[in-house]
Regions:
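Catalytic core of pol beta-like nucleotidyltransferases
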Residues: 1-29, 35-41, 51-110
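Short beta-strand->loop micro-motif that forms the acidic, two-metal-ion catalytic signature
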Residues: 45-49
């Protein structure tokens, strides 16, 4: 289970994504070791951003939000966002990709 600080950072990131992406944002999920609660002090914070459209501009905005949120507040760990469309994520699930299955099972919707 993530800590309060990790959840606060993830929520700040989601709010930033909502402002930057608008209706293109579908969902943000925290995944990886911080979502599972077994992170080391130097672990990053993995976040999956699901969008309606696939374009470089949206991916760039997601990374700009991550940089702004993590640097602007002096958080003790790095944000590592991954963005993809819902359609792509569903395809990974259908293809039984472990990455997608882990996120589906362990990811926390923010």
């Amino acid at each position: 289970m993530p800590t309060t600080l990790e959840l606060e950072l993830a929520q700040a990131f989601r709010h930033g994504c909502q402002d930057a992406l608008g209706e293109d944002l579908v969902e943000v999920r925290m995944d990886g070791s911080r979502a599972r609660g077994d992170a080391r002090p130097d672990s990053d914070l993995d976040l999956l951003v699901l969008t309606r459209r696939n374009c470089a501009e949206l991916r760039e905005r997601v990374h700009e939000v991550a940089a702004s949120v993590s640097l602007g507040r002096g958080w003790p760990f790095t944000l590592m966002p991954q963005s993809m469309t819902c359609e792509h994520f569903e395809g990974l699930l259908r293809g039984e990709r472990l990455y997608a299955q882990d996120i589906q099972r362990e990811g926390i919707i923010i």
